[in-house]
Amino acid sequence: MKKGLWVGLLMTIMLPIKAQKAVIEESVTDIVCDGPTHVIAHYKEIVTVLNPQGASLANFACSCSNKDKLTSFKGQVTDANGRIIRKLKESELQKYELSKHLAVDDYTMFLDYTPPVYPVTITYEWTIDSRDDLITFPRFCPQTDYNVSVKKASYRLKAPKSMTILHAQQNIANEVNIDKSSKYTQLLTLEANDLPILEKKTYSHPLREKMPMALFAPADFTYYDTQGSQRSWKDFGLWQYNLIQGLDILPENVRQQLHQLTDTMKTDREKVEALYRHLGKTTRYVAILLGIGGWKPATATSVYKSGFGDCKGLTNYMRAMLKEVGIASNYTLISTTNHRFMKDYTCAGQMNHAILQVPLPKDTLWLECTNPRLPMGYVHEDIAGHDAIEISEQGGRLVRLPIYADSTNLMRSTVNIHLSQDGTANLKVSQETFNRQYENRIPMAKMNEKERQKILPRIVYAPLTEIKSIDFSENGAKITMETEIKSQKYANQTGQRLFVPICPLHHGYTVPNDAAEREEDIWLEMGYLNEDDITLTIPNGYTIEACPKNISIEQPFASFSFSLHRDDKTIHIKNRLLMRSGMFAKSLFPSLAEFLQSINNIYNQRIILKKI
């Protein structure tokens, strides 16, 4: 059963709210496996939706294919008194193909239901019959959203006694019970009852790491006409390596073109970069998760002919092109959502993406083949620091991708402010963003002029602004924004004084107010460094009456400094904020709130200029 097969209520993650929005009254997953290639899974979900915030939990969705068929479905809706409002039939389901472009037969069966009243209870029952692609069993994941409690959830897996079943779990108190008293079958069961709601807290781990979940997989499996093992990453990698053999054949005209492109280049790195650019110019990505459409990539020839592919196909195509010019590379499986694979569980169902590893003499490159717009070898935020499985002739090997140091996720800003006597100001801003902050700036760099002008006020806080120019340039993992603006009321004028903001770049930070209730440790997923260099030219006829004092704050999770230097005509300000990624004790949460409030206080201060 494929990694990408997900069934059940479509639980879209909502914006955080304190009120509970739904109750999972009962969740039943009942699986019968009668051999290495056949599984029947029966599901029952009863959910009470309490208010409109939980409306999306009333929807139904399951992914299917020619090998994973929905064989039965029924549902009903009842009101608070138990009266049946409506029966839901299989004929109401809508079918959505996952891709019209790729040679996959996967599709989604979907029912979009909006409750007429609240509270309302929805019951769904359905069965999936799966054949020939049993790499993992359906997972047990009874709680997949914030502010939803669970009364009763159960998982039952019946399989041949001769089959070795591997399993792993997180955030579930009960252990898997294994009953082998029957002569021919074994029964694995697991329950999770009376689960309180998961609340979204600031500076805490993401939902995926808090959810109760258990994974199950056969140690040895049959996938179509292949056999494989998941007893170790090495074994799993050997199966995946054999699966992709013979898929790297390129047409003769393509081979000649690649040699014309690279034969005169002196280094392998130059060749990799040339082919990476070629990939970006000649192909297009179609978003299909690993496991959906199978584990086998499309052939390099088919990707060349069609001009598009999913992560598997594009990665294999790049691998084939590198092989043609004599450069070895390794197909690599990774998760874009989970940083770590489950401990001692060396099975599929934990990765959803394919990338390419290129080991060079002095460096190892990681190529994101679905987005060649990124600089070659740039490790983006969805994979940086994540576990991955490198696939080679020797089998699979657990590796961990590099992650950029906090201080290299840099935003460096230079601001020149020419202030007039009436409080108007001309501002010239040059802002360089690197690595993770570079990624955050990519969407704006791709916008047209009109769209950029709508976004700029969120970056430069200057009232009544006239944008004179805004330009972007890109060099590797660096985007530079240059803008010139005029603010009609940059400084507030009161009598003989001008009250001037000390920094037009930062509007302040949201200060958490739940420090007293903190139960979780602090988790800062992304560290970064902001450096501001601001020069304010004082208008003629004014002198400095008051300025904020220099300050420096040091905490385990961050550091901040503000310094101001002055002379007769100019004020020079420097801000430096370093946020450190990682886990910090919950006892530091009041200090974090105080730290953020201190920064806000500094940014909200004013320089006071007095008319001479």
Stretch-by-stretch model annotation:
Residues 20-612:
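A sensor for short, sequence-defined functional sites
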Residues 1-21:
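Bacterial Sec-dependent N-terminal signal peptides
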